[in-house]
Amino acid sequence: MFILASQSPRRQALLKRVVNDFEVQPAQIDEHETPLTAPGDYVQTLAQRKGEAVAVQYPTATILAADTAISFQGTLYGKPKDRQDAYEMLRQLSGQTHQVYTGLWLMKDGLVQQKVVQTDVTFWHLSTAEIEQYLDQNEYADKAGAYGIQGAGALLINKVNGDFYNVVGLPVSTVARMLQN
């Protein structure tokens, strides 16, 4: 049995590229209980907490848990609270390079592997009108950093250095290699 410990539709779609048959079992944890640390450590800790929470219920299953966050100049960006919060995030990221981190936790045959994948993303310089036009698409609400690279958010991006799918939410090639080990 293979379990994805995430309810993210993007992670589910990406995992299908690597695993044919899996179940979705979101972890029931309070993410706010995880102290803010360095971005890579933060996402790794959250992925571990999610994976371990599901492993208690399914100790013999293969379980994949992941968490993604955006970091810019030492600040972690999660999902925006509202449109104004999303506007501020995008304004701050405009013309800048930020980092997207995904922590991965995989339990297979009772053994645990953990990895953190980092991708650098550079935004174009965005006008107020461009930001407002993007926000009008209403795809920002459930996305860290207030954008989705796989949707209209692609128009905001000048350059990606690293794994594109990491920015979507699941670094597929890294997951495939972890599963081979």
UniProtKB/Swiss-Prot annotation:
It catalyses: dTTP + H2O = dTMP + diphosphate + H(+); UTP + H2O = UMP + diphosphate + H(+). Coiled coil: none annotated. InterPro entries: ITPase-like_fam (IPR029001), Maf-like (IPR003697). Disulfide bonds: none annotated. It is found in: Cytoplasm. It is an enzyme of class 3 (hydrolase). The record marks R10, T68, Q150 as: Important for substrate specificity. Its EC number is 3.6.1.9. The keyword Cytoplasm applies. GO terms for cellular component: cytoplasm. The active site is at D67 (proton acceptor). Keywords: Cytoplasm, Hydrolase, Nucleotide metabolism. One of its GO terms (molecular function) is UTP diphosphatase activity. Pfam families: Maf. Its cofactor is a divalent metal cation. GO terms for biological process: nucleotide metabolic process. Belongs to the Maf family. YhdE subfamily. PANTHER family: BIFUNCTIONAL DTTP/UTP PYROPHOSPHATASE/METHYLTRANSFERASE PROTEIN-RELATED (PTHR43213), BIFUNCTIONAL DTTP_UTP PYROPHOSPHATASE_METHYLTRANSFERASE PROTEIN-RELATED (PTHR43213:SF5). Nucleoside triphosphate pyrophosphatase that hydrolyzes dTTP and UTP. May have a dual role in cell division arrest and in preventing the incorporation of modified nucleotides into cellular nucleic acids. This is dTTP/UTP pyrophosphatase. The lineage of its organism: Bacteria, Bacillati, Bacillota, Bacilli, Lactobacillales.
